[in-house]
């Protein structure tokens, strides 16, 4: 659950179909101007797209790979280069995890921690990590256009859900105290 949640929170990928459909062959290194970025190709609700993962996702995916005995012999770069058709999110027995088990485990954890609802009174779900991702990017000043491409949403949908947060998330920019990059 840990690696799954952290991956959701740092890619903007949808819980369920997109994340659980992810295979090692869908992950690759993207090189640009001498820099290496982790690219994740997903087939989702709207269409196929490639998302750039935050750098720390490498650690979460490597930790996930170490849970799968069928790929232990490979280091991370070898694993990516091998383009395996193996599911990324598996149990320790190499079986793909299910939405039902993830939801059940996540809900039990939230209950145990007393975190079932957010400050806004809404029930938290694994999909909440997608909202977390979007909010974090908007706070960093990422445009709704760029974010829509990353997340596979329309700018209209992003504006509908997040426009009320934008002035608050970027108060230092709107106040003139800090320039947007």
What are these regions (language model features)?
Residues 1-16, 35-37, 83, 130:
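Basic, Lys/Arg- and aromatic-enriched nucleic-acid-binding interface segment
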Residues 1-2, 95, 99-103, 117-140:
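Short basic/aromatic active-site micro-motif
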Residues 7-8, 136-140, 150, 161:
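Short alpha-helical segment immediately N-terminal to, or the first helix within
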Residues 11, 20-69, 73-79:
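Conserved tyrosine-mediated DNA breakage-rejoining catalytic core shared by Y-recombinases
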Residues 35, 42-47, 151-175:
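Catalytic-site neighborhood detector that most strongly recognizes the C-terminal catalytic loop/helix
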Residues 42-66, 81-108, 125:
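C-terminal catalytic core of Y-nucleophile DNA break-rejoin enzymes
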